[in-house]
Structures are given as structure tokens and as C-alpha cells.
């Protein structure tokens, strides 16, 4: 790394009498911050109206609703089995990237969409592979792949006319931003998203400045 090399030459100048530090005019490369892309609530509402009532559409609606309702990762969705979701109690169990499982609530609209899919479309899709345990399957009754999931989302993003590419991460970002904008605390959001380091969750605070000001205006006696 440049910093280490620069430190070495600084040492050589001070201790060994090196005439010049060859790194002194070299600028450290700027590390670009990864842009966080997310949808507005109105865009989410539009998105959820796009899937039709075909078996594919019913499945796709369940996928979209569940990704947005829970903020889970693409890998967590495609690895999910039917036993991981409890529609009656309204939660799912997600192991994710960490060993420790986390429990995530599922909202009413997502529960209804997943229940409709499980009671109708999924049974048809797995007719040639009835032992399949993965929740989301393709036309062949096999688990939806990562590539397949991205293709599904891209299709609906283009239908909606979004300026950004619709990906699982965009829906995960949308979940995080909307939760914070509506009053969720960072620590709780960290638990829901499965972040080991809270700094990974805090990046979303940049999109909640208006909410923070509203809280201040309501709470501070001299605001």
C-alpha cells in the first residue's frame, strides 16, 4: 500500500539520511464510495402492481414482496426452504451469511403474496419435482438461481421504466432507507439486515436527514 511505502521512505529520510522521499508527490488514490440506489415508496407501489395473475406472475409478486418486506439478500432468498417461513406467525428464519440465524417479521402484504404462491403456483411448478424443498422454484421445479432472480427483477424494472437497474440489492436498500425514514432505530435495523458491523447499517442514515430534523423539531423544547 502507498501509505506503508511512504512511511518507509520517511523513516529512511530521518534515520538513514535519504535525500528525497520518492513518494512525496504521489497522491493517494481516491476511494469512491459505493452509490446506494433505492426506490421511492411510490415506485415500490408501482412495482408491486406489475406481476400478472399467471403462475409466473404470482411467484414473481411473492418474490418482490418478500425481498422488500424483509430486506434479505439474494442468496438468502434463493436458499430459503418452505420450512424457513411461518406465515401463520408472520416471520421467517434466515441463516444468511452468518452462522447465527435471525428472525425477521413479514408484513401483511408479503404474507398474502407468499401464501397465494404456496397454495397455487408453487404446487403446479413442482409437479414434476414434488420433493423440492426450496421455496422459490422455476418452470422445471428446480430452485430459482441467482441469475434467474436477477433476470426476474430486471424484467420488472424495465417494465416500470425505472432509471436504475432493479436488483435484489436495490430492494434491500429500499427496505433499509424506508425503515429508517419511518422511525426504525439503527440497532434494530442492523439485526434485521444481518450486518455484523453497525457501520454497514449506518450508511443509510444519510438518506434520513429530514426525518431526524422532524424528530428534533418535535422533541426539543426550544426547537
Q: Where do the model's predicted regions map?
A:
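Conserved catalytic core of the tyrosine transesterase superfamily
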Residues: 1-223
Amino acid at each position: 500500500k502507498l501509505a506503508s511505502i511512504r512511511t518507509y521512505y520517511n523513516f529512511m529520510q530521518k534515520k538513514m539520511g535519504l535525500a528525497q522521499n520518492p513518494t512525496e508527490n504521489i497522491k493517494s488514490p481516491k476511494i469512491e464510495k459505493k452509490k446506494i440506489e433505492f426506490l421511492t415508496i411510490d415506485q415500490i407501489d408501482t412495482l408491486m402492481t406489475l406481476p400478472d395473475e399467471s403462475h409466473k406472475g404470482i411467484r414473481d409478486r411473492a418474490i418482490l414482496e418478500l425481498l422488500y418486506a424483509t430486506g434479505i439478500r439474494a442468496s438468502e432468498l434463493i436458499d430459503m426452504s418452505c420450512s424457513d417461513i411461518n406465515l401463520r406467525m408472520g416471520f421467517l428464519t434466515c441463516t444468511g451469511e452468518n452462522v447465527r440465524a435471525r428472525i425477521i417479521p413479514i408484513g401483511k402484504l408479503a404474507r398474502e403474496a407468499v401464501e397465494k404462491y404456496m397454495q397455487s403456483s408453487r404446487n403446479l411448478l413442482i409437479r414434476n419435482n414434488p420433493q423440492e424443498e426450496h421455496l422459490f422454484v422455476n418452470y422445471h421445479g428446480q430452485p430459482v438461481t441467482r441469475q434467474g432472480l436477477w433476470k426476474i427483477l430486471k424484467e420488472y424494472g424495465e417494465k416500470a421504466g425505472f432509471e436504475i437497474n432493479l436488483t435484489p440489492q436495490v430492494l434491500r436498500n429500499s427496505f433499509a432507507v424506508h425503515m429508517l425514514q419511518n422511525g426504525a432505530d439503527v440497532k434494530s435495523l442492523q439485526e434485521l439486515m444481518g450486518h455484523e458491523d453497525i457501520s454497514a447499517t449506518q450508511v443509510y442514515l444519510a438518506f434520513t436527514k429530514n426525518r431526524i430534523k422532524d424528530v428534533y423539531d418535535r422533541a426539543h423544547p426550544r426547537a
